Design a protein with these regions (language model features):
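Mature catalytic core of soluble alpha/beta enzymes
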Residues: 1-187
Length: 187
């Protein structure tokens, strides 16, 4: 970050090295999704499900009064089981980060796009992390951050954030959840 120059007064960011790139994709997508949801709600839209590049944000329930039923994609693309879980959501967001959509393979080893800032290599703690939370921007940031943390660290963060819940898909395919996650599981 020493070559990133932020000028708050001028509201600019300058990258000293012309080969550098700054990708705010996930956070920007989550923020934009949340802005659209709030604007629609302010305009009187009571029932809508937004899906913006995998960020899902519900405004209210479905028109029939039932919650929205959403599958969480199985990161094991070879599996016949397409979803690892199904949730009922109402007025909140569901965002997942994982190693299964943006990746490349070199000599049989798959490298994904979520880089661990400590190792500067793709994070290897999980196959996927899904976050249920009231704000899509925060959900996006949390799913990426927690993907880069050991389970206990991520669980501690989620448990201390009121209203946030998480599902972790471990490398062996097993699932772990935060304490309040069960309330969202489809009945």
């Amino acid at each position: 970050f020493s070559k990133v120059i932020i000028d708050e007064e001028a509201s600019t960011v300058y990258l000293e090295d012309p080969k550098m790139k700054l990708d705010v994709g996930a956070v920007a997508k989550g923020y934009a999704t949340e802005r659209v949801a709030r604007t629609l709600k302010e305009k009187g839209v009571d029932h809508i499900l937004l899906s913006v590049g995998g960020n899902i944000r519900a405004v209210g329930r479905r028109a029939d009064g039932k919650p929205w039923k959403l599958d969480i994609q199985n990161p094991d693309l070879e599996s016949e089981q397409k979803a690892v879980d199904t949730l009922d959501i109402d007025g909140i967001s569901l965002v997942s980060s994982g190693d299964y959509e943006r990746y490349y393979t070199v000599e049989g080893v798959r490298y994904h796009h979520i880089i661990d800032p400590d190792t500067l290599m793709p994070a290897a703690y999980f196959h996927a992390v899904s976050i249920v939370y009231k704000d899509s921007g925060w959900s996006d940031a949390l799913s990426t951050a927690i993907f880069n943390m050991p389970y206990e660290e991520g669980l501690n963060l989620i448990e201390n954030m009121e209203g946030a819940e998480a599902l972790w898909v471990l490398p062996d395919g097993s699932l772990k959840t935060s304490s309040g996650y069960e309330a969202y599981r489809s009945k």
